[in-house]
């Protein structure tokens, strides 16, 4: 004798009301013309009731006959079992037809047992032209055993904004939930859901919600103990332990970044930035910027900024004494030491036929004469 197949009570109860609930889809091919279709596909139907056929809910833009008295039918509908956490629906707008939808309500009526149902699509949008899945989730909280009622209210409209016949459809369903236990428990207000996974409140994370979340994160080995609060190790302080508490002061503009450690500006070194990298100090206001390297102010140059700069220079008869000030050798003068004393007299033209000695001025007379203005010098 053949053994009869055993069905769960949920399946048997669904089978008992199939004649008034379900219109099986006869044409499994492409939807004809331009219209709207919504159905539970064969795979999902098999999971729910063990019957592998498409179940039409909306056909050719109209609600299926079993939905006409849906409230009466759902009173006999069994609760969704513990092991079923979601249900998939498939919908499609065929041809060029445009349909719009809105989930007016997704609400748990027993919030201590189940949270509000979820959907994987925006609550307001357009029905796609390609067959797509809409998943409705039933999030049991895992806090207690019980049956939760929940409401799904959706309206579908055509391109003119008119609701299709018999929508909005306001349906009440029931979901069986059971208390869950998470190994190790859930801390800091987290709760164990029916999948035995801790769901953590804002600010906590981890397998047991044992870790607090600090933004910005705790630095330098700090420990986040509650959201936004760090315990800092010795030597550090600040909201996120980003500041070092130096026992000694950093000199010369140094910055403390770690207990006993200073970041020194260029040219300085030492634990407290007290040492210059230049063995001999920079002169004339220069600053040490590296090992034996000075940055000189304008007007000076050289390794120690000891050499003044004269522009364009003092020529062959002078030396630069101060910035843009030349010290000329004896017999030379001028800003750049390029003018010679007595040069105009020595090179003046002699009268024709005159003797050299007769018309050459004596040294005493030459010394007694005033030099002409520098601008009249020939050089």
Curated annotation (Swiss-Prot):
Q: Which gene encodes it?
A: Wif1
Q: From what organism does this protein derive?
A: Rattus norvegicus
Job of this protein: Binds to WNT proteins and inhibits their activities. May be involved in mesoderm segmentation.
**What protein name is recorded for this chain?**
Wnt inhibitory factor 1
Q: What induces it?
A: Induced during the differentiation of CG-4 cells.
Spell out the subcellular localization from the entry: Secreted
Q: How does it assemble?
A: Interacts with MYOC.
Signal peptide: which range, if any? 1-28
Compositional bias ranges of the Basic and acidic residues kind: 356-373
Entries under PROSITE patterns matching the protein: EGF_1 (PS00022), EGF_2 (PS01186), EGF_3 (PS50026), WIF (PS50814)
**Which Gene Ontology terms describe the biological processes this protein takes part in?**
positive regulation of fat cell differentiation; Wnt signaling pathway
- Which keywords fit this entry according to its UniProt record? Developmental protein, Disulfide bond, EGF-like domain, Glycoprotein, Repeat, Secreted, Signal, Wnt signaling pathway
Q: Where do the record's glycosylation annotations fall on this chain? A: 88, 245
In residue numbers, the region (Disordered) covers 348-379
């Amino acid at each position: 004798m053949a053994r009869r197949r055993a069905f769960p009570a949920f399946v048997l109860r669904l089978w008992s009301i199939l004649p008034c609930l379900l219109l099986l889809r006869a044409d499994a091919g492409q939807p004809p013309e331009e219209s709207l279709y919504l159905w539970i596909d064969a795979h999902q139907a098999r999971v729910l009731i063990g019957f592998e056929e498409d179940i039409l809910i909306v056909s050719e833009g109209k609600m299926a006959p079993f939905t006409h008295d849906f409230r009466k039918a759902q009173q006999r509908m069994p609760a969704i079992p513990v092991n079923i956490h979601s249900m998939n629906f498939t919908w499609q707008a065929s041809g060029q037809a445009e349909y719009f939808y809105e989930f007016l309500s997704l609400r748990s009526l027993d919030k201590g047992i189940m949270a509000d149902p979820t959907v994987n699509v925006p609550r307001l949008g357009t029905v796609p032209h390609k067959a797509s899945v809409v998943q409705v989730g039933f999030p049991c909280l895992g806090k207690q055993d019980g049956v939760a009622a929940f409401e799904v209210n959706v309206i579908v409209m055509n391109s003119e904004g008119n609701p299709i016949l018999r929508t909005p459809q306001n349906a009440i369903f029931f979901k069986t939930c059971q208390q869950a236990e998470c190994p190790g428990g859930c801390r800091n207000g987290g709760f164990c859901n029916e999948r035995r996974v801790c769901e953590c409140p804002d600010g906590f994370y981890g397998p047991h919600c044992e870790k607090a979340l600090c933004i910005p994160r705790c630095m330098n080995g700090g420990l986040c103990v509650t959201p936004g609060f760090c315990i800092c190790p010795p030597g550090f302080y600040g909201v996120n332990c980003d500041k070092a508490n130096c026992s000694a002061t950093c000199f010369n503009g140094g910055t403390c970044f770690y207990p006993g450690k200073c970041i020194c500006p260029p040219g300085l070194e030492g634990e407290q930035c007290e040492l210059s990298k230049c063995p001999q100090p920079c002169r004339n206001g220069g600053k040490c910027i590296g090992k034996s390297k000075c940055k000189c102010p304008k007007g000076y140059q050289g390794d120690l900024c000891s050499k003044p700069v004269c522009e364009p220079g003092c020529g062959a008869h002078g030396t630069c004494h101060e910035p843009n000030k030349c010290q000329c050798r004896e017999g030379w003068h001028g800003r750049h030491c390029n003018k010679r004393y007595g040069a105009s007299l020595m090179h003046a033209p002699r009268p024709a036929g005159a003797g050299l000695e007769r018309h050459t001025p004596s040294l005493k007379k030459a010394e007694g004469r005033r030099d002409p203005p520098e601008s009249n010098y020939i050089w």
